[in-house]
């Protein structure tokens, strides 16, 4: 079984779905879709439905619909559950919640879990923000980790499993990257960026998202979502632009 979306590609931009489906020694029997779906064609926050994949004919089970966690029925025909999604290193991005709940499901149903690791686009040195409080645990803050957690998805999986931060621990294996250094941002990896969601079109979007995403969720100002610069601005009719700019400049924030 494969949990993935359009970001699951090799360095020739071939989908992991196609790679595993065509591999002679692999029997890919099911796909699992996170938020936005396996093919990335579902709007943010909209429920993803169970479908048949048009390209491979495989069943696609939703992990962002009636259930957020794979059921025994979904997992009955698989031996190994593989996770291959490019994340952005921010706690409120839902893919890591999907990964964690899938790891729990794998543990509870006796399935091996494999993470195909990918770079953290903001690097592995930036760790910022408070831990989520107990009464605020949700699908957009599933684990008690900093808002910017400074780990790759494989490293995070190892921590969640090793520190027993989930209800059950799985038989976990991480396929590590070659050549990645913690100081690298995504551009420095030389890899082609595939949008991790419709509103994360560029690798630098991962830098803007943690800053403005929460403001957008509060619903009282625009952060550029729906325009060509998602998360790169904040604006509202009641903002006095020159006064705000003066107050911000007076802080003398470096950069």
How would you label these PLM feature ranges?
Residues 136-210:
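Conserved anion/nucleotide-ligand pocket segment
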Residues 180-255:
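Glycine-rich, aromatic-lined ligand/substrate-binding cores of catalytic
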Residues 27-36, 116:
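Short internal beta-strands
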Residues 40-44, 114-136:
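Glycine-rich, charge-decorated loop segments at or immediately adjacent to ligand/cofactor-binding or catalytic sites
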Residues 1-26:
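N-terminal phosphate-binding or glycine-rich loops at protein starts, especially the Walker A/P-loop
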Residues 87-99:
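Glycine/threonine-rich flexible loop motifs
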Residues 48-78, 90:
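Glycine-rich oxoanion-binding loops at beta->alpha junctions
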Residues 24-26, 106-112:
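A short helix->loop->beta-strand "cap" motif at the edges of active sites that frequently abuts
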